[in-house]
Amino acid sequence: MLLLKKQTEDISSVYEIREKLGSGAFSEVMLAQERGSAHLVALKCIPKKALRGKEALVENEIAVLRRISHPNIVALEDVHESPSHLYLAMELVTGGELFDRIMERGSYTEKDASHLVGQVLGAVSYLHSLGIVHRDLKPENLLYATPFEDSKIMVSDFGLSKIQAGNMLGTACGTPGYVAPELLEQKPYGKAVDVWALGVISYILLCGYPPFYDESDPELFSQILRASYEFDSPFWDDISESAKDFIRHLLERDPQKRFTCQQALQHLWISGDAAFDRDILGSVSEQIQKNFARTHWKRAFNATSFLRHIRKLGQSPEGEEASRQCMTRHSHPGLGTSQSPKW
């Protein structure tokens, strides 16, 4: 699918802008209706003046999205360029974010979590087959296609994705709580970083809090580097051994021993009937509400500590700037708003 940048003097001649859906580091996302039709899109509006020095990030996102066509991945439908802006017309998904939907459910089981993870694994496996590493998988980037109960889950936000031309990538990228050990060590890394992030997401989906967290940045990084986490009682008492085994294979310290997406898809917790059908909504939703309140997990953070850690490992200034643009931070599980979270 080749999407050329279509030149326009005024985007309002192409789309009727309805309302603001959200905003990012250097863009706004608007609900827009295509002129002459009823078709709606999520229009990502990027001021060119905000792109100075960051052109490569956006060009990379476009290059990645042009290669993708998968039912569980938000599609790029069109690209427009005006004298002042670049516009990415994205497939509109209307079902809301992952945590919000879990909180709204009447019941929620391991089987539901397994089904969710299986869909995301399928999408990420597809990306990996194209040589694409997402690099920023986290719950906020998992959206439901529609508001209906049987809606599929969609992977979004490819701003940090990278086409892996060789065997490994080098720039530190991601979100601290989801970042793989090899990335923290500033070693060359590849597709396995996405599998690690899916391990963190799977863990959260089953208990409502993250596997790695601490008020101290060095301790947080130490936990990740050692792959040090627990299946705490009572939160994991009603979770199957199969689920725990699945997570252990995804949160494997050694990327060479870590499951690939294909191996994860074949695990019985995903492909078989090993997932329990017991309702865990009460405990999971309580923990999600405590640890991922919208005001916390939407909040951008100052990535000073992460970058200090990277500097100690000798990363180049160019890589450090890329990392600074990549970082997003969220709240420490179980802490009040007055405390300073480090995960």
Curated annotation (Swiss-Prot):
<keyword id="KW-0539">Nucleus</keyword>
<keyword id="KW-0112">Calmodulin-binding</keyword>
<comment type="function">
    <text>Calcium/calmodulin-dependent protein kinase belonging to a proposed calcium-triggered signaling cascade. In vitro phosphorylates CREB1 and SYN1/synapsin I. Phosphorylates and activates CAMK1.</text>
</comment>
<feature type="binding site">
    <location>
        <begin position="21"/>
        <end position="29"/>
    </location>
    <ligand>
        <name>ATP</name>
    </ligand>
</feature>
<dbReference type="GO" id="GO:0004683">
    <property type="term" value="F:calcium/calmodulin-dependent protein kinase activity"/>
</dbReference>
<dbReference type="InterPro" id="IPR011009">
    <property type="entry name" value="Kinase-like_dom_sf"/>
</dbReference>
<dbReference type="InterPro" id="IPR017441">
    <property type="entry name" value="Protein_kinase_ATP_BS"/>
</dbReference>
<comment type="similarity">
    <text>Belongs to the protein kinase superfamily. CAMK Ser/Thr protein kinase family. CaMK subfamily.</text>
</comment>
<feature type="region of interest" description="Calmodulin-binding">
    <location>
        <begin position="290"/>
        <end position="311"/>
    </location>
</feature>
<dbReference type="GO" id="GO:0005737">
    <property type="term" value="C:cytoplasm"/>
</dbReference>
<keyword id="KW-0418">Kinase</keyword>
<feature type="domain" description="Protein kinase">
    <location>
        <begin position="15"/>
        <end position="270"/>
    </location>
</feature>
<dbReference type="InterPro" id="IPR000719">
    <property type="entry name" value="Prot_kinase_dom"/>
</dbReference>
<keyword id="KW-0106">Calcium</keyword>
<keyword id="KW-0963">Cytoplasm</keyword>
<keyword id="KW-0547">Nucleotide-binding</keyword>
<dbReference type="GO" id="GO:0005524">
    <property type="term" value="F:ATP binding"/>
</dbReference>
<keyword id="KW-0723">Serine/threonine-protein kinase</keyword>
<feature type="binding site">
    <location>
        <position position="44"/>
    </location>
    <ligand>
        <name>ATP</name>
    </ligand>
</feature>
<dbReference type="Pfam" id="PF00069">
    <property type="entry name" value="Pkinase"/>
</dbReference>
<dbReference type="InterPro" id="IPR042696">
    <property type="entry name" value="CaMKI_beta_STKc"/>
</dbReference>
<keyword id="KW-0808">Transferase</keyword>
<dbReference type="GO" id="GO:0005516">
    <property type="term" value="F:calmodulin binding"/>
</dbReference>
<dbReference type="InterPro" id="IPR008271">
    <property type="entry name" value="Ser/Thr_kinase_AS"/>
</dbReference>
<protein>
    <recommendedName>
        <fullName>Calcium/calmodulin-dependent protein kinase type 1B</fullName>
        <ecNumber>2.7.11.17</ecNumber>
    </recommendedName>
</protein>
<feature type="active site" description="Proton acceptor">
    <location>
        <position position="136"/>
    </location>
</feature>
<keyword id="KW-0597">Phosphoprotein</keyword>
<dbReference type="GO" id="GO:0005634">
    <property type="term" value="C:nucleus"/>
</dbReference>
<feature type="modified residue" description="Phosphoserine">
    <location>
        <position position="338"/>
    </location>
</feature>
<dbReference type="GO" id="GO:0106310">
    <property type="term" value="F:protein serine kinase activity"/>
</dbReference>
<feature type="region of interest" description="Disordered">
    <location>
        <begin position="314"/>
        <end position="343"/>
    </location>
</feature>
<keyword id="KW-0067">ATP-binding</keyword>
